[in-house]
Swiss-Prot record:
Organism: Lactobacillus acidophilus (strain ATCC 700396 / NCK56 / N2 / NCFM)
Protein name as annotated: Phosphate acyltransferase
This protein's UniProt keywords: Cytoplasm, Lipid biosynthesis, Lipid metabolism, Phospholipid biosynthesis, Phospholipid metabolism, Transferase
Purpose: Catalyzes the reversible formation of acyl-phosphate (acyl-PO(4)) from acyl-[acyl-carrier-protein] (acyl-ACP). This enzyme utilizes acyl-ACP as fatty acyl donor, but not acyl-CoA.
Record-stated family: Belongs to the PlsX family.
Gene: plsX
């Protein structure tokens, strides 16, 4: 039986939203065990007694890592926090994967320092799946903040892992890999990006060249590789812009005159389709590529729905033996 360790105390809607998602997923994933780490009393109040069985368990912890906690200090000082105890279960082989909605930096630290890097991987990278305009498939972008500074060889390894993820988990044959840069020409960018371009071009990947920021959501690449600083800034920009556009549309239509409101009714289906395009819940969470088990971060404001999809994502990563394949591939290099 596959086992997912879940930090039940992380995120704005914890633990209620997490428990709801687990109970829903539990009924659809009979070969998967869910271990919830957190305040025993709170969790017991939310979980019906008849649901606690071989497929669902609670591991009592007494501490929680807050968003404002300094990541590395937090995982060292809060040994009995839900996140750290869950990470240690994965490290000790008592669970196969770790999921959290909590402090991103602390989760990255748990992945790197507790669960550990795969031999041969220089630096793990954080990778979400983001929307595109012409498809429901979206695209992967890595790194979005696990590393403040990057080297060309890091970008190559992230591209290799992300390409394999796109094939195994997203079902994309021969994924198109692009390098985020400030121009399409091969000589664009600083020294890191120019050298990364050459490494990607000379690899066995389906490298399609540089991609600029204004092309990211057009669906011209299945995987976009970038340094962590730029990737994090771009991710926040995409999230913020999407939210603002949808809010402005809604506000304009609901607060307009009678003709505007009548027009809104006529295009209701199209607006729902637009909202669906920018709905990232169906993609699951951001994956920390390059550590010894699946470690996945879901947005801290998530409700039941994105958590449910993330549980399905994590389960598939375990089932497809993604990390084992990474280990076989990179330990030989």
């Amino acid at each position: 039986m596959r086992t997912i360790a879940i930090d039940a105390m992380g995120g704005e809607n914890a633990p209620e939203a997490i428990v709801k998602a687990v109970l829903k997923a539990k009924n659809e994933m009979p070969e998967t065990k869910f271990l919830l780490f957190g305040d025993k009393e709170q969790l017991r109040e939310l979980i019906p007694a008849d649901q606690i069985n071989d497929q669902l368990g609670v591991v009592a912890t007494t501490e929680t890592i807050a968003d404002e906690d300094e990541p590395v200090k937090a995982i060292r000082r809060k040994k009995d926090s839900s996140m750290v105890v869950a990470a240690n279960f994965v490290k000790e082989g008592k669970a196969d994967a770790l999921l959290s909605l909590g402090n991103t930096g602390a989760l990255l630290a748990c992945g790197i320092f507790i669960i550990g890097r795969i031999k041969g991987i220089v630096r793990p990278g954080l990778m979400p799946t983001l929307p595109v305009q012409n498809s429901d498939d979206g695209f992967n972008m890595v790194d979005v903040g696990a590393n403040a500074k990057s080297k060309p060889e890091y970008l190559l390894q992230w591209a290799e892992m992300a390409s394999y993820y796109a094939q195994k988990i997203r079902g994309i044959d021969n994924p198109r890999i692009a390098l985020l840069n400030n121009g399409a020409e091969s000589d664009k960018g600083d020294d890191v990006h120019q050298k990364a371009y050459e490494l990607l071009k000379d690899s066995d990947l389906n490298f399609v060249g540089n991609i600029e920021g204004n092309e990211l959501l057009l669906g011209n690449a299945d995987v976009v590789v970038t340094d962590g600083f730029t990737g994090n800034a771009v991710l926040k920009n995409i999230e913020g812009t999407s939210s603002v556009i949808l809010h402005l549309l809604k506000d304009s239509l609901l607060n307009g005159n009678l003709m505007t409101k009548m027009g809104a009714l006529m295009v209701k289906g199209s607006l729902a389709s637009l909202k669906s395009k920018f709905d990232t819940a169906k993609y699951g969470g951001a994956v920390l590529l390059g550590v010894n088990a699946p470690v996945v971060k879901t947005h801290g404001r998530s409700n039941e729905r994105p958590i449910y999809y993330t549980l399905k994502q994590v389960d598939k990563m375990i089932k497809e033996k993604l990390v084992e394949d990474f280990r076989d591939e990179f330990s030989e290099k």
